[in-house]
Structure formats: C-alpha cells, structure tokens
Curated annotation (Swiss-Prot):
The chain crosses the membrane at residues 18-43. Keywords: Electron transport, Membrane, Mitochondrion, Mitochondrion inner membrane, Respiratory chain, Transmembrane, Transmembrane helix, Transport. Gene3D superfamilies: Cytochrome b-c1 complex subunit 9. One of its GO terms (cellular component) is respiratory chain complex III. Component of the ubiquinol-cytochrome c oxidoreductase, a multisubunit transmembrane complex that is part of the mitochondrial electron transport chain which drives oxidative phosphorylation. It is found in: Mitochondrion; Mitochondrion inner membrane. It comes from Schizosaccharomyces pombe (strain 972 / ATCC 24843) (Fission yeast). Residues 1-17 are mitochondrial matrix. GO terms for biological process: mitochondrial electron transport, ubiquinol to cytochrome c. This is Cytochrome b-c1 complex subunit 9. Component of the ubiquinol-cytochrome c oxidoreductase (cytochrome b-c1 complex, complex III, CIII), a multisubunit enzyme composed of 3 respiratory subunits cytochrome b, cytochrome c1 and Rieske protein, 2 core protein subunits, and additional low-molecular weight protein subunits. The complex exists as an obligatory dimer and forms supercomplexes (SCs) in the inner mitochondrial membrane with cytochrome c oxidase (complex IV, CIV). The keyword Manganese does not apply.
Length: 67
C-alpha cells in the first residue's frame, strides 16, 4: 500500500522521477558538505586560521608596543 503511493507520487511520471532525483541529490550534497566540514573542523581543531589569527595579531601588537 505504501509502496504504491510512493510509486504514484514520485516515480510514475518521468518529470516526477527526475524532480525526485534532483531534489534528493541537492539535499544529499548539503548533508555531505555539512558532514565533511564537521569532520574537517574536528580533525584540524586549533590549526585553522580563525583560531590561530588572534595569537599572531597579539604578537604584532606587542612588537609595535616595544618600539
């Protein structure tokens, strides 16, 4: 019963089938990007520019104060 409903909604017409494929691919890409970004951030914690930038800026300000 549920399979016939899914078939009639998503796969019966060619246009519905292609729309289902494109929408699924779009959301799968978003999910994959979010997953890989979280893995990358966890693997490189403390090494990204956003986290290291304040240390470099503080060193530059300290060097200017010494002059």
């Amino acid at each position: 019963m549920a399979s016939s409903t899914i078939y009639n909604i998503f796969f019966r017409r060619n246009s519905s089938f292609y729309a289902t494929i494109f929408v699924s691919a779009f959301f799968a890409k978003i999910g994959f990007d979010v997953f890989t970004d979280s893995v990358w951030k966890r693997a490189n914690a403390g090494l990204t520019w956003d986290e290291v930038k304040p240390r470099f800026l503080n060193k530059d300000e300290d060097a200017e104060d010494d002059e």
